[in-house]
Amino acid sequence: MPREIITLNVGQCGNQLGSEFFKKICSEHGILPDGSLSTNEFIDDRKDVFFYQADDQRYVPRSINIDLEPRVLDSIRTSEWSNFYNPENFIIPTNNGAGNSWANGYYTTEKMSEIEEIIDREVEHCDSLEGFFFCHSICGGTGSGLGSKIMEMISEKYPKNILTSFSVMVKENPDVVVSPYNSILTLRRLITECQSVVVFDNSALADITHTQFGVDEATVFDMNSIISSSMSAFTANLRFPSTLYNSLNSLMIHLCPSRFSHFLMTSYTPLRQVNQISSRTSAIDVMKRLIQPQNIMARTRLKEGKYISMCDFFQGDVSYDEINEALQRFTDRRLAEFVPWNKEAIKVVHTRVSPLVKRGNRMSGMLLANNTSIRYYFQDILKAFDQMFKKRVYLESYREQFHDNFQEFEESKEIVKCVIEEYAKAESIEYSDYSYPIHKYLKGIAKEKIAE
């Protein structure tokens, strides 16, 4: 019995990414832009995870598209996919957007009741909801601010369902000058409201695009295409189920053993055009490529960290014997360094592939990993925030919405610092006795709010 997942695409980046993801999985399930099927051929899949059938038998995505600026939503509604989405699930903006400010996005309250109503309606359409996917950027105003508000609402209203975020971050040369403010405030919600967060970094995606496709300057389409390939592989076992990790819950139990250190890195190989000819590769080659720093979709000091957990997903013409042999060689050679307290840190999964999609290679692989080096990424964001906040620059919209009280910044900073510390402690054998200061800090904040 499939368990459904509702996808929320928030902000410009989130809607562009969500659109590419659905195009990708539509091709795998034989769903055309109007929601009809491209073939009557039987496919042993679970379309119901991300789609439902309307009265006219068309497949409609369990997708909610939200933005405070009309451009991206209008481009979707006027494209060849205009009849694919449920028109009632578009949140049409009535103002000029969030102005790249987290505070403006977070305090845009006039749309929250409409958003909540749409989410409730989609939940009612599900027989057994497993969770929510959340696509957004943490740097702009809508994806970060309004996105944070929506995450809080989902976490409070549906605490038993998994909230997984696909978060695009910018650490180097951000286009949005207040990105450090937006990022630190959003990281707080990603820590406290989500059960897992898959991190994507624009600079890493641009480098991968240049290396794999020879593109001098990566476009949004190029980067979203890479992310959607990863998301497709991530969800393959949910949509084409096998015997292992065919639910979000089973996967998260392995990847995120701690409540708050749930930030995941990903890589995908090979990223080649369909018409490119590639040499025959092996499972061990795929496993080695997946952990190469240049293939990870977030730039961290990977060699200075340790893996808390990892899961390799194989697709294509590869046997279980070859996969198990590759796993044995991988562990015997100690090709990756793991934390000392997790003896079951690495898992491998063979996922089925759609018979409708032409493949340009014998096999492909996708990595999902929880690595302690992510703390260095957060440290860089924290450093950028401190440099700006100490100067008290670009605070106009935040000062207005926060009424000159910047406690929100201070609390967010402390929560991020707690997670950085937790990832550092996770590298030692004493981690099992760790006291988790973030729990104490969050309880303190809760008591203060009750007192108010």
UniProtKB/Swiss-Prot annotation:
Compartments, record wording: Cytoplasm, Cytoskeleton, Microtubule organizing center, Centrosome; Nucleus
Q: Which UniProt keywords apply?
A: Cytoplasm, Cytoskeleton, GTP-binding, Microtubule, Nucleotide-binding, Nucleus
A Gene Ontology annotation in the biological process aspect, one of them, is: meiotic spindle organization
**A GO term for molecular function:** microtubule nucleator activity
InterPro entries named among the record's database cross-references? Gamma_tubulin, Tub_FtsZ_C, Tubulin, Tubulin/FtsZ-like_C, Tubulin/FtsZ_2-layer-sand-dom, Tubulin/FtsZ_GTPase_sf, Tubulin_C, Tubulin_FtsZ_GTPase
Identify the residues that bind GTP.
139-145
Q: Which domain of life is it from?
A: Eukaryota
Deletion phenotype, per the entry, is: RNAi-mediated knockdown results in a severe disorganization of microtubules in the nucleus and impaired cell growth.
**GO cellular component terms, semicolon-separated:** centrosome; cytoplasm; gamma-tubulin ring complex; microtubule; nucleus; spindle
Per its UniProt record, what SUPFAM superfamilies does this chain match?
Tubulin C-terminal domain-like, Tubulin nucleotide-binding domain-like
Which Pfam family, any one of them, does this sequence belong to?
Tubulin_C
Cite the PANTHER family for this sequence: TUBULIN (PTHR11588)
Role played: Tubulin is the major constituent of microtubules. The gamma chain is found at microtubule organizing centers (MTOC) such as the spindle poles or the centrosome, suggesting that it is involved in the minus-end nucleation of microtubule assembly.
Entry similarity comment: Belongs to the tubulin family.
- Tell me what this protein is called: Tubulin gamma chain
